[in-house]
Structure formats: structure tokens, C-alpha cells
A protein has these predicted regions:
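Short Gly/Ser/Thr- and Asp/Glu-enriched loop/turn motifs at secondary-structure junctions
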Residues: 4-6, 175-179, 213
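Short, conserved non-catalytic motifs in the polymerase core
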Residues: 5-33, 47-59, 118-140, 163-166
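Active-site and adjacent loop segments of nucleotide-processing enzymes
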Residues: 225-252
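Short acidic, Pro/Gly- and aromatic-enriched capping/linker segments at domain boundaries
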Residues: 209-223, 234-237
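Conserved polymerase palm-domain catalytic core
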Residues: 70-178, 182-200, 217-223
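Active-site-proximal segment of RNA-dependent polymerases
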Residues: 33-93
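A common structural junction motif
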Residues: 199-208
Length: 252
């Protein structure tokens, strides 16, 4: 397989001000990306979690918005933590990604093509922001963290009278919007334990880091700011930066 080099350029996000390095692939490269992504789709559909919503057809912002709007009103939703994976796309370990794909993909020709496409990206690690295949691979990679949250964020409790051991979830809800992670729980103590575990899992298993400035807040005391909206128990608003940008565009 032969492709023209990927052309990279910088783009400043209008709301966050973050600088993104975007890769523009040749038409031939994009075709192979699409063919490979289509062939891998049964795997992606099986692995990507229900509440991973970014870049998933039929989900996206609208799906995340509906879910958060509903969950923020539940009596069990008392505290929340919003985590951000630092430089997610550039930090994805290709070694780990290839190991996961080797385990999950049985077709050697498809695996070889996937590895070849991954190796076209600049640097030794990371995926290409702007690539059709990369957005699916990123969701696939993070699905391991999502399922860890769903299946392993619990603690055991022993009944002193009967000795019976029961498991209780540390969180009530989890939602991934690509590298933004929302955890909702009943207590600050449980949520703190949950955050430590997912942070350790990301570091140890996926070689990713959580941004150190994450914090925990009480639902209703402050809004959940995610996917461009601010969520309160009794109403949902538009993030201020998006509203101001839309107003400026309208005035033009």
C-alpha cells in the first residue's frame, strides 16, 4: 500500500482555545481508511460501550445530552466528577493498540492493513485527528476504560451479623464523550475511590493520563459542563462560550 504523506496543520478550537494538530490524508489514503474501518465495524460495534457517544452514528452530542439531562435529575445523582484524558489522540500507545487489535482481529490481511495505516501517522505514538479510521480506533481503545468503569468500579461490603459479602458500585453512571469522562455517584468518598482506580487503569493499562485539574462537585450546586451544555437538575443551558459565538455569528 502506497500513500502520499499526510499533511498536518494547526487549528484553534473556537470555544476552548485548544490547538489541535489535524492531519489531512490523500484521497487514496481516505479510501483505504474507510475500507479498513468498514471491515473492522463488527469489532467496533461489539466493543464500544453504550455510553461512548462521540463520533458514533446515531449517538453524538444529542444522545449524550439526553442521557445527562435525565441522570442529573435522579435522586441517586448527588456528586459528579468530570475527567479529561490529556492529549488523548497524540498519547494513544500504538504498541498497546496493536496488541489489543492482534487479540481481537482474526484476519491477518485486515490486521496488516490496519497496522500499515496506523504506521502512516507522524511520530511513534498517537492517532490522526481528522481520520475516519482514527476516530473509531480511539473509541475502541477507550472502550477498555469504559468497560472497566462499568464492570470493576465497585467495593465489597461485609454484613457483620451474617458475614455475607455484597458488592456495591462506586458510581451510578458513566459517560464517555471521546476523551471527556463523566462519573456520577452517591458520595464523595466513593467517587474519589472510583477516580483513583480509573486513573490508575488508564495509566497502567492504556498509558494515558488524566488531566490533574479534575475536581468533584455536588449535583445542583454547580452545573455539569459537557458536550456544549450546562446541566442542572431543573434545566439545561448552552455553554456561555457557544452562546456568545452564535450571537456574534448571527449579528454578522
Amino acid at each position: 500500500y502506497s500513500f502520499a504523506p499526510i499533511r498536518y496543520f494547526r487549528r484553534v478550537e473556537p470555544i476552548s482555545g485548544k490547538i489541535r494538530i489535524i492531519g489531512r490524508e490523500s484521497i487514496r489514503h481516505q479510501i483505504y481508511d474507510y475500507v479498513c474501518g468498514t471491515a473492522l465495524m463488527p469489532l467496533f460495534r461489539a466493543k464500544v460501550g453504550r455510553w461512548q457517544t462521540a463520533s458514533i452514528p446515531g449517538r453524538g452530542i444529542a444522545d449524550a445530552r439526553r442521557a445527562i439531562k435525565q441522570r442529573v435529575r435522579e435522586p441517586s445523582s448527588r456528586v459528579f466528577g468530570k475527567l479529561d484524558v490529556r492529549k488523548c489522540y497524540p498519547s494513544i500507545s500504538r504498541e498497546v493498540l496493536k496488541r489489543l487489535l492482534t487479540r481481537d482481529v482474526g484476519d491477518k490481511r485486515l490486521l496488516d492493513l490496519t497496522f500499515h495505516l496506523i504506521d502512516q501517522y507522524a511520530g511513534d505514538d498517537g492517532l490522526n485527528i481528522g481520520s475516519y479510521l482514527s476516530q473509531w480506533l480511539a473509541n475502541y481503545y477507550l472502550s477498555y476504560a469504559y468497560h472497566y468503569c462499568e464492570q470493576h468500579l465497585s467495593k465489597e461490603r461485609v454484613n457483620r451479623r451474617t458475614g455475607e459479602i455484597t458488592a456495591r458500585r462506586l458510581i451510578t453512571h458513566v459517560l464517555f464523550y471521546m476523551d471527556d469522562i463523566l462519573l456520577i455517584g452517591r458520595s464523595k468518598r466513593d467517587l474519589t475511590i472510583a477516580v483513583k482506580r480509573i486513573r490508575d487503569y488508564l495509566h497502567d493499562e492504556l498509558r494515558l493520563e488524566i488531566h490533574p485539574t479534575w475536581n468533584m462537585k455536588h449535583v445542583g450546586a454547580e452545573p455539569i459542563d459537557m458536550v456544549g451544555f450546562t446541566f442542572w437538575p431543573d434545566h439545561t443551558g448552552v455553554r456561555a462560550g457557544i452562546f456568545l459565538r452564535a450571537r456574534r455569528s448571527f449579528r454578522r
